[in-house]
Amino acid sequence: MKHLHRFFSSDASGGIILIIAAILAMIMANSGATSGWYHDFLETPVQLRVGSLEINKNMLLWINDALMAVFFLLVGLEVKRELMQGSLASLRQAAFPVIAAIGGMIVPALLYLAFNYADPITREGWAIPAATDIAFALGVLALLGSRVPLALKIFLMALAIIDDLGAIIIIALFYTNDLSMASLGVAAVAIAVLAVLNLCGARRTGVYILVGVVLWTAVLKSGVHATLAGVIVGFFIPLKEKHGRSPAKRLEHVLHPWVAYLILPLFAFANAGVSLQGVTLDGLTSILPLGIIAGLLIGKPLGISLFCWLALRLKLAHLPEGTTYQQIMVVGILCGIGFTMSIFIASLAFGSVDPELINWAKLGILVGSISSAVIGYSWLRVRLRPSV
């Protein structure tokens, strides 16, 4: 029991469990004995009905859209705290992850197009390497435990949130044909209610969560990625202390173990089970996976590092306190973990064209993401000293 308590007290424990869940999913998805059970579990229908409102999704979508909204709620709370009281409190510090994220989307897309521009079909996948899987990137960073400066973790969170918002906008503009304007209207009203609650000084977390559920439902029905609702709710929950209590900090404390030990491992288990059937290493010579690998492994760190360097040189932004430019460069490598978001964009880009293209895209995403994770982790492990 003492060893178990020591493990769960470790800052790295959540990352370790997430990686184990991902490996288990890969094994089960590619084993003849367990692949059927694994896919049946993910396809299990779960229906929620309240009056005339009905949400009928399989288990995978409930995990990705509902549980991950809770994860993004926690991320929103942590980033808001740092924006108001911590390492992103000044305008120039807050601008830093925004500029980094822009570079981290533009350069990978351009590198991909350098390989695929001549092919009108594969060219449609230009957004694949522009995405970052925030859950896995943070999971790899968590493996380093207390070595990681808090400001560096917050920088990665803020960068990845902006990256995800960019990916959501790209999907809505270029890969979605059926946005529901009525649902987006309901979402806008819900956001307005959250703003009014915050301005009026409402401090009951439950009220914000209730409006957040309405917002989440509206965003889900609109065709936009529903996890966005979690970030928005997190930004509106009050942070200021009154009588020694802060609603945002209290909720952050409550959510952290649930996210670290249940939601993220479950997300990893549900999404890391990529079937390698039909995927061969011969496909690595194709321009599609080569473009994705180049975008994730080279384009992400290059774009983030270059735009950060320009921002510092032009005095548009400041480094987060307690971090170095070299650490920012390595975070750029971790942002090359595109994984689930990249696979999702690939399915939208090629799903109606050729299933073989999706297999090639998966190969490129896996190679690029795993390489980014291993290189980023190894480099940070060498560069960061263990805390005493």
From Swiss-Prot:
Membrane-spanning residues: 12-31, 59-80, 97-116, 123-130, 155-176, 181-200, 205-222, 224-236, 254-272, 287-310, 340-350, 358-380
Q: Name one GO cellular component term.
A: plasma membrane
How does gene deletion manifest?
Mutant lacking this gene can grow in the presence of 0.1 M LiCl, but not in the presence of 0.6 M LiCl.
Q: Mutating D163C: effect?
A: Loss of both Na(+)/H(+) and Li(+)/H(+) antiporter activities. Abolishes ability to grow on high salt medium. Cannot bind Li(+)
Return one Gene Ontology term, BP aspect: response to salt stress
Q: Which domain of life is it from?
A: Bacteria
Impact after mutating K300C? Increases Km for Na(+)
Periplasmic topology ranges:
32-58, 117-122, 177-180, 223, 273-286, 351-357
Effect of altering V254C?
Answer: Affects the pH sensitivity. The pH profile of the activity is shifted by about half a pH unit toward acidic pH. Causes a shift in the pH profile toward basic pH
Effect of changing D164N: reported as:
Loss of both Na(+)/H(+) and Li(+)/H(+) antiporter activities under all pH conditions examined. Abolishes ability to grow on high salt medium
Asked if tRNA processing is a keyword of the record, the answer is no
The cysteines covalently paired via disulfide bonds are none
Site residues (Important for pH response), renumbered to this chain? E241, E252, V254
- Keyword hit for Membrane: yes
Kindly give the InterPro entries that the UniProt entry links to this protein. Answer: Na/H_antiporter_dom_sf (IPR023171), NhaA (IPR004670)
Q: Region Important for dimerization: start and end of each range?
A: 45-58
Please describe, based on the UniProt annotation, the reported consequence of changing D133N.
Answer: Loss of both Na(+)/H(+) and Li(+)/H(+) antiporter activities under all pH conditions examined. Abolishes ability to grow on high salt medium
| Inducing or repressing factors | Expression is induced by Na(+) and Li(+). The Na(+)-dependent enhancement of expression is augmented by alkalinization.
Q: How is it placed in the membrane, per its record?
A: Multi-pass membrane protein
**Where in the cell?**
Cell inner membrane
Site described as Essential for cation binding and translocation, located at D163, D164
Describe the task this protein carries out. Na(+)/H(+) antiporter that extrudes sodium in exchange for external protons. Plays an important role in the regulation of intracellular pH, cellular Na(+) content and cell volume. Catalyzes the exchange of 2 H(+) per Na(+). This stoichiometry applies at both neutral and alkaline pH values. In addition, can also transport lithium and is involved in lithium detoxification. Binding of the Li(+) and H(+) ligands to NhaA is coupled and antagonistic.
Q: Which family does it belong to?
A: Belongs to the NhaA Na(+)/H(+) (TC 2.A.33) antiporter family.
Q: What is known of its domains?
A: Displays a non-canonical transmembrane assembly, which is termed the NhaA fold. A unique assembly of two pairs of short helices connected by crossed, extended chains creates a balanced electrostatic environment for the binding of the substrate ions. Is organized into two functional regions: the pH sensor region, a cluster of amino-acyl side chains involved in pH regulation, and a catalytic region containing the ion-binding site located approximately 9 Angstroms apart from the pH sensor region.
The identity of this protein, by name, is Na(+)/H(+) antiporter NhaA
Protein species of origin: Escherichia coli (strain K12)
